[in-house]
């Protein structure tokens, strides 16, 4: 029997596994895909957010700011490509700049350092390719960019090196509560071979499918909507078109279309935000890609879209409550959710790992190695 079984080997599950590998515990990670980082974690904006957008007091706010703070040491210790290039949220002449004032106020309440609102003249010194309609912007120097593949792989490899077992191509089909433990029935996705796992604690880090596992064991039902985001990746020749991550004023659907350099020297434009019923729908659409070019031009002019080298789409796990769901299910002792992890999930991942591992350690009275 395992002390802890983690469902999902994305950046969240892998971060939790790494933190748990510091304890005297028998831990496994169960992943239905053929490798780690094969779901939401592989198709996102690759941004380490500063933390000014989340509602003060929310888990998103607390964990975003903490995760951001952890990135310098993590990137050094685990050799994760990471750069603090800073971010700008720009306001155009058709928008009310009070939206920037609100972001500034939220950011200051969340403890984000160095925030300030800049006028157009100063913005153009930083980013000459801003659109002619941009009037002002919020500057966040602690914003950064990262490689989500390297980040997830680094967490997983470090966890594995320190004793965590990984079971890939293994799909969880059912979870049953027992006295003091859980039984997980799984099937190998290549061979259809069934396998049973038993664990004292289950950690649900299953992305867009996290509600399904919660609802197997708890009467407190979750509902997660898959929100599809499409992206265009441009050639490295376009990589210097902007140097900061350029955001638009956020809406209820997200942070708008961003234009950002990547840590590998490309330029990334995206995402769209469309709710879908199919939780496997990672296809791109012509309408979606066309809208990216049009919407990106509102904040950055002359984006060289003819230099697009690939496009892709990913799914965000949006929960109806608009916050991360982290903690033990009230009516399922030993079942810990890390669910509804949408933006700023990548930024928050190190802190989520820290928090969830701490919850599991307290439940099991684990001691550090």
Predicted regions and their residues:
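Glycine-rich FAD pyrophosphate-binding loop
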Residues: 22-42
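Dinucleotide-binding Rossmann-like beta1-alpha1 core, especially the glycine-rich loop
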Residues: 46-126, 256-257
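Short beta-strand to alpha-helix junction loop
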Residues: 55, 62-65, 90-99, 138-157, ...
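Helical element adjacent to the flavin cofactor pocket in flavoenzyme catalytic cores
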Residues: 138-200
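C-terminal catalytic lobe of FAD-dependent flavoproteins
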Residues: 254, 263-264, 280-369
């Amino acid at each position: 029997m395992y002390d802890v079984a983690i469902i999902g080997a994305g950046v969240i599950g892998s971060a939790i596994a790494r933190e748990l590998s510091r304890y005297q515990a028998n831990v496994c990670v169960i992943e239905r895909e053929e490798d780690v980082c094969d779901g939401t974690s592989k198709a996102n904006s690759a941004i380490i957010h500063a933390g000014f957008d989340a509602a003060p007091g929310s888990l998103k706010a607390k964990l975003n700011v903490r995760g951001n703070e952890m990135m310098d040491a993590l990137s050094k210790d685990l050799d994760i490509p990471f750069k603090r290039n800073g971010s700008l949220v720009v306001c155009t002449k058709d928008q009310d700049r009070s939206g920037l004032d609100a972001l500034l106020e939220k950011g200051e309440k969340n403890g984000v350092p160095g925030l300030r609102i800049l006028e157009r003249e100063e913005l153009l010194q930083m980013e000459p390719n801003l659109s002619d309609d941009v009037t002002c912007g919020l500057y966040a120097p602690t914003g950064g960019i990262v490689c989500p593949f390297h980040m997830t792989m680094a967490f997983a490899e470090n966890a594995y090196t320190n004793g965590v077992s990984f079971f890939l191509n293994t799909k969880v089909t059912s979870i049953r509560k027992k006295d003091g433990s859980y039984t997980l029935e799984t099937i190998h996705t290549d061979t259809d071979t069934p396998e049973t796992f038993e664990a004292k604690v289950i950690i649900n880090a299953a992305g867009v499918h996290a509600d399904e596992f919660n609802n197997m064991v708890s009467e407190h039902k979750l509902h997660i909507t898959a929100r599809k985001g499409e992206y265009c990746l441009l050639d490295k020749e376009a990589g210097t078109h902007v140097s900061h991550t350029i955001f638009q004023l956020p809406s209820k659907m997200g942070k708008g279309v961003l234009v950002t350099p990547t840590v590998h020297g490309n330029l990334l434009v995206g995402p769209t935000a469309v709710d879908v019923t199919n939780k496997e729908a990672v296809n791109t659409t012509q309408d979606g890609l066309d809208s990216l070019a049009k919407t990106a031009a509102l904040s950055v002019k002359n984006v060289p879209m003819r230099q697009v080298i690939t496009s892709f789409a990913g799914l965000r796990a949006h929960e109806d409550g608009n916050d991360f769901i982290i903690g033990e299910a009230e009516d399922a002792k030993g079942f810990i959710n890390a669910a509804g992890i949408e933006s700023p999930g990548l930024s928050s991942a190190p802190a989520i790992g820290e928090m969830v591992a701490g919850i599991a350690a307290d439940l099991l009275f684990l001691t550090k190695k």
